[in-house]
Amino acid sequence: MFSFGTVFTFALLLIPLTEAVDSSYVAAVYEHNLILNPDPRVPLSRLEALQHLQKNLDIFEVQAARAAQQGAQIIVFPEDGLHGFNFSRTSISAYLETVPDPEQESWNPCLEPLRHNNTEVLQQLSCMARRNNLYLVANMADLQPCSVSAAPSSCPPDGRWQFNTNVVFRSDGLLVARYHKYNLYFEAAFDAPPEPEIVTFDTPFAGKFGLITCFDILFQEPTVILVEKGVRQIIFPAAWMNQLPLLDIIQFQRAFSLGANVTLLAANIRNDQLIMTGSGIYTPFSATYHHAQRGDPEEGRLLVARVPVLDPEWLGHNAASGEAAAVDESSGYCYSETCLDSPASTAPVFVSSMMYDPFTFALLNATDGEMRVCNGTFCCYLQYRWVTETGRTELYALGAFDGTHTVNGRYAVQVCALVRCAGSDASSCGQEVDEAESKLDFMLEGKFASRHVYPSVLSSGMVLEQPERVEAAADGRVSLKHSNVMGGLVTACLYGRMHHLDTA
């Protein structure tokens, strides 16, 4: 059995998403068991805040040095990794530093520490990058003064913006990028910037990278905008609370990398109480990732991997467009236009809540077969075959949902999911499960109203599986084929984001 605490690495040959790449670089991400402020609602003095920040900075220093020793050229630390969470707007005040805009001002905090007051964290991060000769990405709390009296003004009443902010330092310590998180997730201490920021930075070893933070990954701005602008390498600090069966962070990190055809450097917090774990270095053809097991020591984890450069400008040619692979007509699976027009499942359908959304489900009752389940006019199609009989006591269902998710965020989705149910009753379908014994070969297909569809296969023990085949057609049909599953199947999913249907 696989352990959650294991670092997994796999390389794969997916559908031909890009041309072969003969250039590479070494990336590192650090999953940080951060030292928290025990009472974040109580305001501190600047000295007290610095004493707390220093405890986490000292850990960052050790990990940056370890990464550099392994040849890393860039390291990513997680969201909230220095200060923590659950502050009020007032109580975070002592943690704030004003981060200058690198597009307006060239500043190396390590070499010019006296240029700006109250920038101790910026100075230490700058020197950390410089000492270890690597690019460094960290997340911190930023204060930007603004004018309340200006008309019109979106400035907060206290005359300052407080931003959840990613900062990037060049290998010589120069501050080269600043990104203010746009899609906040219950963050009372911070403001969303008035407009979404599309922020990139260039490196001499891999070209261009784009910056997003945690909840941003689910939204059009800035994430999809970056990808549509041709940014193929994304930095992703996160403090992500996992939720099965569809949005465990490693599951969606991998799905996003595949669906968007990008490299994702993802660093998460490790906090067992908040169900936070899961970091990785993902490309369209490889993944190195870590997911802790319940009961594992609550500690940090450094991941280092060599990955191909994907920036087409750096490579000097255009990357492939991501067209679907040729259909394998001998596969035994249906890829014709009639797949989704197949007769509806003879199994009765039922509604059960999954991720707080009312999915329409049908049970897999046969050893093999095909079925179609619809939620409104959105339909999901499945062909399946049980490979082993040992897991036939486990219940599986095909689920479909087309609508707006409204709990802990509001966004429109279309989802096709093959899930193992938590128990032997249909009402358990959609509940959280992380173990399974059943092995199935399958092809899952849906016709989506968006190009932004993210495929994933998750097997027992929080192990990611490489989909054998993913195809996307011009008419919105997306299919996910997988066989020879390594472990019991927990979830297979096509997660579509309907950005054009999002409402405030």
Swiss-Prot record:
Q: Which residues are glycosylated?
A: 86, 117, 261, 365, 375
Q: Where in the cell is it found?
A: Secreted, Extracellular space
Q: Residue span of the signal peptide, if any?
A: 1-20
Q: Which InterPro entries match?
A: Biotinidase-like_euk (IPR012101), Biotinidase/VNN (IPR040154), C-N_Hydrolase (IPR003010), C-N_Hydrolase_sf (IPR036526), Vanin_C (IPR043957)
Identify the enzyme class. hydrolase
Gene Ontology MF terms = biotinidase activity
| Entry keyword annotation includes Hydrolase | yes
Entry's family note: Belongs to the carbon-nitrogen hydrolase superfamily. BTD/VNN family.
Protein name per UniProt: Biotinidase
Q: What is the organism field in this record?
A: Takifugu rubripes
The lineage is: Eukaryota, Metazoa, Chordata, Craniata, Vertebrata
